[in-house]
């Protein structure tokens, strides 16, 4: 063994540290932070050399990604060189359909289907003011603080929902106004089923109301339709489907919705 390979000789003789793999993994994980720090702090000639090296790495990575993507595309997009004769211009677009074109067309078709699929029964709803939605709750020893709000509309919270500590809870969702199930009507079958709510997809009033799970007229909710036995074209059972609320839950005391099919 050459004299300058004493490190390899030591490894072969005594082995590595017990935590070598863990230290190596952590060092590789920190590499991104080190590179980012160097990019911000280096100056002068070292900064130029660093930028040049990073540029070369990025160019190589882009070439590698491009080559990988081109390898996935099936079918010749250009005539083969060994054929001996070139195709005329009017036949250039008559090559064998490749996977990229098929994927592109399928994505466009899915977008069109999605646009047709969600034609909601209530396209417009009346706006609700914050004064109507939230009730101010006075807090503090002398009831002088008014930073808490209580939602006056019906809401949906998930199964694993836990309230925050009382002193830090800014928005209160009363337990008496929480809904877990909805009366969902299937427009084609003409039947109404009492189905559990899975989540609130979109509240037309505000994204904040969507996040809070407020149930108002026109809200799109996701319901569990496994009881209906709906099946996709591929033979899979449909688990969740969207429905739109058609009534005022805070007035009626229940949630009525129409399934979007």
Curated annotation (Swiss-Prot):
Provide this UniProt record's keywords sorted from A to Z.
Nucleus, Ribonucleoprotein, Ribosome biogenesis, rRNA processing
Q: Principal place where this protein is found?
A: nucleus
| A family per Pfam | Ribosomal_S8e
| Motif Nuclear localization signal 2, residue range(s) on this chain | 51-58
- Write out the GO biological process terms: maturation of 5.8S rRNA; maturation of LSU-rRNA
> Disordered: where is this region?
1-38, 59-85
Its annotated compartments are: Nucleus, Nucleolus
Where does it sit, as one GO cellular component term? nucleolus
| Short motif (Nuclear localization signal 1): ranges | 11-18
Q: Spell out the Basic and acidic residues composition-biased ranges.
A: 17-37
Q: Can you tell which superkingdom this protein's organism belongs to?
A: Eukaryota
InterPro entries attached here? NSA2_fam, Ribosomal_Se8/biogenesis_NSA2
Q: What functional role does this protein have?
A: Involved in the biogenesis of the 60S ribosomal subunit. May play a part in the quality control of pre-60S particles.
Q: Which PANTHER family match?
A: RIBOSOME BIOGENESIS PROTEIN NSA2 HOMOLOG
Q: Record's family?
A: Belongs to the eukaryotic ribosomal protein eS8 family. Ribosome biogenesis protein NSA2 subfamily.
Its assembly, as annotated, is:
Component of the pre-66S ribosomal particle. Interacts with NOP7 and RRP1. Interacts with RSA4 (via WD repeats).
Q: What is this protein called?
A: Ribosome biogenesis protein C3_06160C_A
Q: Which organism is it from?
A: Candida albicans (strain SC5314 / ATCC MYA-2876) (Yeast)
Its taxonomic path starts at: Eukaryota, Fungi, Dikarya, Ascomycota, Saccharomycotina
């Amino acid at each position: 063994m050459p004299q300058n390979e004493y490190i390899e000789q030591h490894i072969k003789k005594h082995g590595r540290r017990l935590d070598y793999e863990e230290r190596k993994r952590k060092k590789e994980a920190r590499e991104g932070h080190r590179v980012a720090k160097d990019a911000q702090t280096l100056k002068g000639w070292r900064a130029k050399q660093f930028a040049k090296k990073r540029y070369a790495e990025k160019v190589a990575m882009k070439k590698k990604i491009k080559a990988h993507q081109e390898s996935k595309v099936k079918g010749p997009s250009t005539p083969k060189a060994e054929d001996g004769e070139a195709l005329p211009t009017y036949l250039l677009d008559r090559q064998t359909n490749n996977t990229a074109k098929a994927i592109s067309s399928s994505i466009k078709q899915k977008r069109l289907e999605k646009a047709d699929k969600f034609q909601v029964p209530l396209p417009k709803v009346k706006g609700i003011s914050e004064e109507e939605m939230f009730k101010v709750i006075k807090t503090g020893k002398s009831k002088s603080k008014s930073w808490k709000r209580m939602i006056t509309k019906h809401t949906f919270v998930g199964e694993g929902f836990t309230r925050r500590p009382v002193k830090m809870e800014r928005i209160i969702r009363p337990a008496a106004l929480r809904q877990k199930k909805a009366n969902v009507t299937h427009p084609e079958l003409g039947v109404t089923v009492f189905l559990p709510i899975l989540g609130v997809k979109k509240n037309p009033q505000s994204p904040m109301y969507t996040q809070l799970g407020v149930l108002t007229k026109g809200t799109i909710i996701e319901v569990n339709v496994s009881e209906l036995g709906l099946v996709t074209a591929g033979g899979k059972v449909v688990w969740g489907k969207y429905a739109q609320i058609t009534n005022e839950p805070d007035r009626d005391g229940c949630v009525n919705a129409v399934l979007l099919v």
